[in-house]
Amino acid sequence: MNAPTSESTSGLGFEVDRDHVGWLTFDRPDSSVNTLTPLLMQELDALLSQLESRIANGQIFALVLRSGKEGSFIAGADVEAIAALSSAADARAASAEGQRIFRRIERLRVPTVAAVDGACMGGGTELILHCDYRVASDRNSTVIGLPEVRLGILPGFGGTVKLPPLVGMQNALGIILSGKPVRPSRAKRIGLIDEVVAAARFRSAVSEFVAGVIGNRVERAPPTLGFGQRLLERMLPAQVQ
Protein backbone atom coordinates (compact mmCIF):
# COMPACT_ATOMS: atom_id res chain seq x y z
CA MET A 1 0.00 0.00 0.00
CA ASN A 2 1.08 3.54 -0.60
CA ALA A 3 2.33 5.64 2.30
CA PRO A 4 0.17 8.57 3.39
CA THR A 5 0.58 11.72 1.33
CA SER A 6 0.27 15.14 2.91
CA GLU A 7 -0.20 18.78 2.00
CA SER A 8 -0.47 21.88 4.18
CA THR A 9 -1.40 25.55 4.15
CA SER A 10 -0.89 28.10 6.90
CA GLY A 11 -3.99 26.97 8.79
CA LEU A 12 -4.93 23.59 7.36
CA GLY A 13 -3.19 20.27 6.92
CA PHE A 14 -4.30 17.36 4.76
CA GLU A 15 -3.16 13.79 4.35
CA VAL A 16 -4.53 10.60 2.84
CA ASP A 17 -3.86 7.38 4.72
CA ARG A 18 -3.34 3.91 3.28
CA ASP A 19 -7.08 3.19 3.51
CA HIS A 20 -7.85 6.17 1.26
CA VAL A 21 -9.26 8.20 4.14
CA GLY A 22 -8.54 11.91 3.96
CA TRP A 23 -7.65 13.67 7.22
CA LEU A 24 -8.25 17.42 7.14
CA THR A 25 -6.58 19.06 10.15
CA PHE A 26 -7.34 22.55 11.46
CA ASP A 27 -4.18 23.86 13.09
CA ARG A 28 -3.51 27.60 13.10
CA PRO A 29 0.22 28.04 13.75
CA ASP A 30 -0.21 31.54 15.19
CA SER A 31 -2.77 30.65 17.84
CA SER A 32 -3.30 28.24 20.74
CA VAL A 33 -6.85 27.60 19.47
CA ASN A 34 -8.43 27.31 16.06
CA THR A 35 -10.76 30.06 14.92
CA LEU A 36 -12.44 30.38 11.55
CA THR A 37 -10.71 33.50 10.31
CA PRO A 38 -11.52 34.87 6.84
CA LEU A 39 -8.12 33.63 5.64
CA LEU A 40 -8.66 30.12 6.98
CA MET A 41 -12.10 29.99 5.35
CA GLN A 42 -10.52 30.99 2.03
CA GLU A 43 -7.96 28.22 2.45
CA LEU A 44 -10.72 25.73 3.26
CA ASP A 45 -12.62 26.77 0.14
CA ALA A 46 -9.53 26.23 -2.01
CA LEU A 47 -8.74 22.88 -0.40
CA LEU A 48 -12.29 21.67 -0.99
CA SER A 49 -11.80 22.23 -4.72
CA GLN A 50 -8.79 19.90 -4.60
CA LEU A 51 -10.73 17.36 -2.56
CA GLU A 52 -13.64 17.34 -4.98
CA SER A 53 -11.26 16.50 -7.81
CA ARG A 54 -9.51 13.72 -5.90
CA ILE A 55 -12.83 12.27 -4.76
CA ALA A 56 -14.09 12.27 -8.35
CA ASN A 57 -10.93 10.36 -9.34
CA GLY A 58 -11.59 7.71 -6.69
CA GLN A 59 -8.57 8.62 -4.56
CA ILE A 60 -10.49 9.35 -1.34
CA PHE A 61 -13.18 7.12 0.19
CA ALA A 62 -14.03 9.22 3.27
CA LEU A 63 -13.01 12.50 4.90
CA VAL A 64 -12.27 13.19 8.57
CA LEU A 65 -12.20 16.75 9.91
CA ARG A 66 -10.14 17.14 13.07
CA SER A 67 -8.02 19.60 15.08
CA GLY A 68 -4.28 19.69 15.55
CA LYS A 69 -4.75 21.43 18.92
CA GLU A 70 -4.79 19.01 21.83
CA GLY A 71 -7.93 19.49 23.90
CA SER A 72 -9.49 22.02 21.53
CA PHE A 73 -11.36 21.55 18.26
CA ILE A 74 -12.53 24.94 16.93
CA ALA A 75 -13.30 27.87 19.23
CA GLY A 76 -15.60 29.50 16.70
CA ALA A 77 -15.49 32.33 14.20
CA ASP A 78 -13.01 35.19 14.40
CA VAL A 79 -14.56 37.66 16.87
CA GLU A 80 -12.37 40.50 15.60
CA ALA A 81 -13.55 39.88 12.04
CA ILE A 82 -17.16 39.93 13.21
CA ALA A 83 -16.61 43.19 15.08
CA ALA A 84 -15.08 44.72 11.95
CA LEU A 85 -18.26 44.21 9.92
CA SER A 86 -19.49 47.75 9.34
CA SER A 87 -23.00 47.16 8.02
CA ALA A 88 -25.87 44.69 7.90
CA ALA A 89 -25.03 44.05 4.26
CA ASP A 90 -21.46 43.11 5.19
CA ALA A 91 -22.76 40.77 7.89
CA ARG A 92 -25.16 39.08 5.48
CA ALA A 93 -22.40 38.65 2.92
CA ALA A 94 -20.02 37.10 5.47
CA SER A 95 -22.77 34.77 6.68
CA ALA A 96 -23.68 33.71 3.14
CA GLU A 97 -20.03 33.02 2.32
CA GLY A 98 -19.60 30.81 5.37
CA GLN A 99 -22.78 28.91 4.50
CA ARG A 100 -21.58 28.42 0.93
CA ILE A 101 -18.27 26.93 2.02
CA PHE A 102 -19.84 24.65 4.63
CA ARG A 103 -22.40 23.41 2.09
CA ARG A 104 -19.49 22.25 -0.06
CA ILE A 105 -18.51 19.92 2.78
CA GLU A 106 -22.08 18.71 3.08
CA ARG A 107 -22.23 17.93 -0.64
CA LEU A 108 -18.98 15.98 -0.91
CA ARG A 109 -19.61 12.59 -2.51
CA VAL A 110 -17.91 10.64 0.27
CA PRO A 111 -18.86 10.21 3.95
CA THR A 112 -17.59 13.05 6.15
CA VAL A 113 -16.78 12.54 9.83
CA ALA A 114 -16.12 15.32 12.34
CA ALA A 115 -13.65 14.15 15.00
CA VAL A 116 -14.23 16.41 18.01
CA ASP A 117 -11.55 16.18 20.71
CA GLY A 118 -11.93 19.28 22.87
CA ALA A 119 -14.05 22.42 22.85
CA CYS A 120 -16.18 22.85 19.74
CA MET A 121 -17.97 26.18 19.78
CA GLY A 122 -19.84 28.55 17.48
CA GLY A 123 -18.64 28.19 13.92
CA GLY A 124 -16.92 24.94 14.89
CA THR A 125 -20.28 23.48 15.86
CA GLU A 126 -21.82 24.75 12.63
CA LEU A 127 -18.98 23.07 10.74
CA ILE A 128 -19.61 19.67 12.30
CA LEU A 129 -23.35 20.02 11.66
CA HIS A 130 -22.52 19.95 7.94
CA CYS A 131 -20.73 16.60 8.30
CA ASP A 132 -22.45 13.24 7.88
CA TYR A 133 -21.19 11.89 11.22
CA ARG A 134 -19.81 13.31 14.46
CA VAL A 135 -17.50 11.46 16.87
CA ALA A 136 -16.49 13.10 20.17
CA SER A 137 -13.89 12.22 22.79
CA ASP A 138 -14.65 11.82 26.48
CA ARG A 139 -11.99 14.40 27.35
CA ASN A 140 -13.07 16.80 30.13
CA SER A 141 -12.61 19.78 27.83
CA THR A 142 -14.86 18.37 25.11
CA VAL A 143 -18.05 20.43 24.86
CA ILE A 144 -20.21 21.46 21.93
CA GLY A 145 -22.15 24.69 21.81
CA LEU A 146 -23.42 27.78 20.03
CA PRO A 147 -22.53 30.66 22.37
CA GLU A 148 -23.21 33.44 19.85
CA VAL A 149 -26.29 34.66 21.75
CA ARG A 150 -23.98 35.77 24.55
CA LEU A 151 -22.37 38.15 22.07
CA GLY A 152 -25.74 39.46 20.96
CA ILE A 153 -25.74 37.60 17.64
CA LEU A 154 -27.14 34.37 16.21
CA PRO A 155 -25.25 31.52 14.49
CA GLY A 156 -24.64 32.69 10.94
CA PHE A 157 -23.16 29.68 9.15
CA GLY A 158 -26.31 27.53 9.06
CA GLY A 159 -26.51 26.29 12.65
CA THR A 160 -30.08 27.45 13.20
CA VAL A 161 -31.18 25.36 10.20
CA LYS A 162 -28.99 22.27 10.65
CA LEU A 163 -29.46 21.70 14.39
CA PRO A 164 -33.27 21.16 14.74
CA PRO A 165 -33.49 18.14 12.37
CA LEU A 166 -30.76 16.42 14.40
CA VAL A 167 -31.85 17.09 17.98
CA GLY A 168 -35.45 18.27 17.72
CA MET A 169 -36.75 21.81 17.99
CA GLN A 170 -36.93 21.92 21.80
CA ASN A 171 -33.32 20.80 22.28
CA ALA A 172 -32.14 23.06 19.46
CA LEU A 173 -33.81 26.13 20.95
CA GLY A 174 -32.28 25.34 24.33
CA ILE A 175 -28.79 25.14 22.85
CA ILE A 176 -29.13 28.22 20.63
CA LEU A 177 -30.96 30.55 23.04
CA SER A 178 -29.02 29.68 26.19
CA GLY A 179 -25.58 29.63 24.62
CA LYS A 180 -24.65 26.87 27.07
CA PRO A 181 -22.38 24.08 25.79
CA VAL A 182 -23.36 20.42 25.81
CA ARG A 183 -21.21 17.59 27.15
CA PRO A 184 -20.58 14.58 24.86
CA SER A 185 -22.80 12.21 26.86
CA ARG A 186 -25.84 14.45 26.49
CA ALA A 187 -24.90 15.31 22.91
CA LYS A 188 -25.12 11.63 22.06
CA ARG A 189 -28.44 11.18 23.88
CA ILE A 190 -30.10 13.96 21.89
CA GLY A 191 -28.58 12.92 18.55
CA LEU A 192 -25.97 15.64 18.13
CA ILE A 193 -23.10 13.13 18.37
CA ASP A 194 -23.03 9.63 16.87
CA GLU A 195 -20.33 8.14 19.09
CA VAL A 196 -18.32 9.04 22.20
CA VAL A 197 -14.89 7.41 22.40
CA ALA A 198 -11.93 7.41 24.76
CA ALA A 199 -9.60 10.38 24.35
CA ALA A 200 -6.62 8.10 25.05
CA ARG A 201 -7.17 6.26 21.76
CA PHE A 202 -9.03 8.91 19.85
CA ARG A 203 -7.43 8.62 16.41
CA SER A 204 -7.62 4.83 16.33
CA ALA A 205 -11.24 4.92 17.52
CA VAL A 206 -12.12 7.43 14.81
CA SER A 207 -10.35 5.25 12.23
CA GLU A 208 -12.43 2.26 13.34
CA PHE A 209 -15.62 4.31 13.11
CA VAL A 210 -14.72 5.49 9.60
CA ALA A 211 -13.88 1.94 8.51
CA GLY A 212 -17.36 0.90 9.62
CA VAL A 213 -18.94 3.74 7.68
CA ILE A 214 -17.01 2.86 4.53
CA GLY A 215 -17.89 -0.80 4.93
CA ASN A 216 -21.59 -0.03 5.22
CA ARG A 217 -21.57 2.17 2.11
CA VAL A 218 -19.13 0.33 -0.13
CA GLU A 219 -21.91 -1.20 -2.24
CA ARG A 220 -23.42 2.21 -3.09
CA ALA A 221 -22.28 3.80 -6.34
CA PRO A 222 -21.45 7.53 -6.30
CA PRO A 223 -24.39 8.47 -8.60
CA THR A 224 -26.80 6.90 -6.10
CA LEU A 225 -25.26 8.86 -3.25
CA GLY A 226 -25.50 12.05 -5.25
CA PHE A 227 -29.17 11.47 -6.05
CA GLY A 228 -29.95 10.78 -2.40
CA GLN A 229 -28.20 13.97 -1.34
CA ARG A 230 -30.18 16.06 -3.83
CA LEU A 231 -33.45 14.44 -2.73
CA LEU A 232 -32.77 15.21 0.94
CA GLU A 233 -31.88 18.80 0.10
CA ARG A 234 -35.30 19.23 -1.50
CA MET A 235 -37.10 17.68 1.47
CA LEU A 236 -35.31 19.64 4.20
CA PRO A 237 -35.63 23.40 4.81
CA ALA A 238 -33.42 25.62 2.69
CA GLN A 239 -30.41 27.32 4.23
CA VAL A 240 -30.97 30.78 5.65
CA GLN A 241 -29.96 33.36 3.06
Give the label of every model feature segment:
Residues N2-P4, T9, P38-M41, L47, ...:
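Intrinsically disordered, low-complexity segments enriched in small/flexible residues
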Residues T160-Q170:
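Hydrophobic, secondary-structure "cap" segments at the distal end of domains
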Residues L65, D78, L127-I128, A187:
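Hydrophobic/aromatic residues within transmembrane alpha-helices
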Residues S67-I101, C120, R150-G152:
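Glycine- (often His-adjacent) and acidic-residue-rich active-site loop
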Residues M1-R66, R100-R103:
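Conserved CoA-thioester-binding segment of acyl-CoA-metabolizing enzymes
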